[in-house]
């Protein structure tokens, strides 16, 4: 019987499904095993004391308007309808239609759009001076996730998993829930890092969050013993190819990563199905996130899944909420987005705190850029990469504080600007990772998430 025939026979079992589903992207010629983070079961690297053990990234695809959410601009409101500054003829200033007020003991300013999230004001650290390099969605979104707008690079979650390893051998360490399909898998991919560090996708932007799941996690046709034997057959052929080649076989690291991915997929059967079952949560917890509420349910499910995976040991969990690209219909569209975000995000922070997880979980909220103060259409805003807002909570950041400032219209950062490389450096710092020392050798040089840039923003750290 030929190997090809045996492989086809094994394809009916979970082992081959795991190999295809979780390791299909294992490409390139990565550094051989033995580099930092190669085994997800190893102890985490710590370059210094960590204040966070995991990250939950609330990713707002489209570019949320900072002037209408967290960065009030009274002058912009007063000058509504006047000619816009510095972007050529035909634009007019657009004042925010939403009222702002201060919240919590810190007096943090927030829009009326967030009645629930404003209750967490004293836990939020607002960075009002973010900037990035390109005002186009695909490039800016990729830079947000990988640090580079031009080249294929490992994603932020992959770097975190590479540095820390997994805290639970039965789970993927990097989860991306409902990522936007149109912007590509590179935003949760591992690029030249071993495929073991790529993100595991749950659902996609094309399907509702209530239907999101992992394909082939369980295989009801076969017993666990049968699945184990079939996977062993596939793995034996993989190892024969890996071990039988003279010297270091090109792509050998990819084969090793595929072997480990297959083993992980097999182990996932014991834990992942229960984690995906939100019916195991109490009615009170589900209500806290807004599950079952019209216009809220989808993102609420994502946030609750994020908490469950964080609690179970995942290192980096990204949840996605798109639709923030409001070139027109600003007021109605922003109300819809804010409603979807408000209760789930507030519930996530409150739930993490109640379970003792917030102190060592960094929650990051933000999009690929912000919005301009002016537009050619009076009911929208255009892309703005020169100044916008992100916020963080937990994980050792200073709650109830703001950092940086944009000008009186919110057009650009004018005080303590924070580049995306600085944000990445700061995030890694909270995890105990030095962004200058977390490197991977590929193509003849050492690569890092921040390339040759990045400064830790120590002012936001507690």
What are these regions (language model features)?
Residues 1-462:
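Ligand-binding pockets and gating/stacking loops
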């Amino acid at each position: 019987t030929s190997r090809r025939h045996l492989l086809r026979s094994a394809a009916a079992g979970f082992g081959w499904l795991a190999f295809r589903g979780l390791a299909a992207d294992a490409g390139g010629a990565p550094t051989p095993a033995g580099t930092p983070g190669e085994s997800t079961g190893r102890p985490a690297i710590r370059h210094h004391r960590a204040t966070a053990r995991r990250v939950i990234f609330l990713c707002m695809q489209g570019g949320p308007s900072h002037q209408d959410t967290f960065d009030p601009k009274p002058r912009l409101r007063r000058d509504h309808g006047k000619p816009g500054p510095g972007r050529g003829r035909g634009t007019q200033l657009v004042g925010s239609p939403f009222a702002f007020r201060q919240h919590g003991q810190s007096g943090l300013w927030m829009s009326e759009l967030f009645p629930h999230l404003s209750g967490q004001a004293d836990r939020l650290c607002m960075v009002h001076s973010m900037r990035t390099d390109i005002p186009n969605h695909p490039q800016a979104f990729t830079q947000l996730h990988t640090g580079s707008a031009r080249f294929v690079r490992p994603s932020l979650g992959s770097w975190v998993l590479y540095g820390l390893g997994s805290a639970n051998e039965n789970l993927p360490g990097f989860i991306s829930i409902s990522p936007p399909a149109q912007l590509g898998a590179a935003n949760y991919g591992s690029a030249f890092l071993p495929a073991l560090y790529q993100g595991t996708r749950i659902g996609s932007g094309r399907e509702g969050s209530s239907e999101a799941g992992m394909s082939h996690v369980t295989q009801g046709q076969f017993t666990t013993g049968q699945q184990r034997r079939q996977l062993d057959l596939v793995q034996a052929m993989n190892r024969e190819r890996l071990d039988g080649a003279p010297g270091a076989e090109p792509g050998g690291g990819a084969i090793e990563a595929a072997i480990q991915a297959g083993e992980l997929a097999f182990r996932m059967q014991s834990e992942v199905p229960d984690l995906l079952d939100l019916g195991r949560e109490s009615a009170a917890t589900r209500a806290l996130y807004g599950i079952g509420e019209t216009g809220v349910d989808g993102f609420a499910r994502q946030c609750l899944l994020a908490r469950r995976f964080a609690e179970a040991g995942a290192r980096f969990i990204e949840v996605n909420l798109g639709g923030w690209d409001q070139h027109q219909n600003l007021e109605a569209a922003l109300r819809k987005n804010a409603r979807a975000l408000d209760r789930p995000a507030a519930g996530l922070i409150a739930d993490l705190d109640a379970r003792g997880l917030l102190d060592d979980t960094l929650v990051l909220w933000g999009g690929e850029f912000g919005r301009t103060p002016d537009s050619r259409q009076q009911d929208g805003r255009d892309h703005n990469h020169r100044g916008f807002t992100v916020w963080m909570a937990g994980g050792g950041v200073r709650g109830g504080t703001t950092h940086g400032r944009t000008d009186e219209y919110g057009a650009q950062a004018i005080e303590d600007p924070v580049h995306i490389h600085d944000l990445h450096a700061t995030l890694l710092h909270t995890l105990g990772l030095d962004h200058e020392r977390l490197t991977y050798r590929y193509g003849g040089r050492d690569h890092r998430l921040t390339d040759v840039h990045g400064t830790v923003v120590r002012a936001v750290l507690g």
